């Protein structure tokens, strides 16, 4: 009976590690879908995983809009056609007054 419990425990751990690896990524395009980016958390040794791109109205960070070695840190950029606005830190449709060019 004890051996059966150990076998079930090993099986559960193996399944969990397989699930964790399924969403991992090493670079931007090859591993993630077209509406996702390869994202690493803010902590130094965070694992990378695929996450959705920012939609209109979602939070964003103007400093995380460019990939670092093929992955993003902290937040995915806004999806194509949207820009991350500095005043509100949200993904929005581009306009004359909310593009980054107007701040430089």
Swiss-Prot record:
Pfam families, per database record: Prokineticin
Lineage top rank: taxon: Eukaryota
Q: Where in or outside the cell?
A: Secreted
What's an example GO cellular component term for this entry?
Answer: extracellular region
Q: Which UniProt keywords apply?
A: Disulfide bond, Secreted, Signal
**Disulfide-linked positions:** 25-38, 32-50, 37-76, 60-84, 78-91
Residues of the signal peptide = 1-22
Question: Which family is it part of?
Answer: Belongs to the AVIT (prokineticin) family.
Function description: Cytokine directly involved in hematopoiesis.
Q: What is this protein called?
A: Astakine
What is the phylogenetic placement of the source species in the record? Eukaryota, Metazoa, Ecdysozoa, Arthropoda, Crustacea
């Amino acid at each position: 009976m004890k051996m059966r419990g150990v076998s079930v425990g090993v099986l559960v751990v193996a399944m969990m590690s397989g699930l964790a690896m399924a969403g991992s990524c090493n670079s931007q395009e090859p591993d993630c879908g077209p509406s996702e980016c390869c994202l690493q958390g803010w902590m130094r040794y965070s694992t990378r995983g695929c996450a959705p791109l920012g939609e209109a109205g979602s939070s964003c960070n103007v400093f995380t809009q460019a990939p670092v070695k093929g992955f993003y840190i902290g937040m995915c950029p806004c999806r194509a056609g949207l820009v991350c606005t500095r005043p509100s830190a949200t993904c929005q449709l581009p306009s004359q007054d909310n593009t980054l060019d107007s701040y430089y």
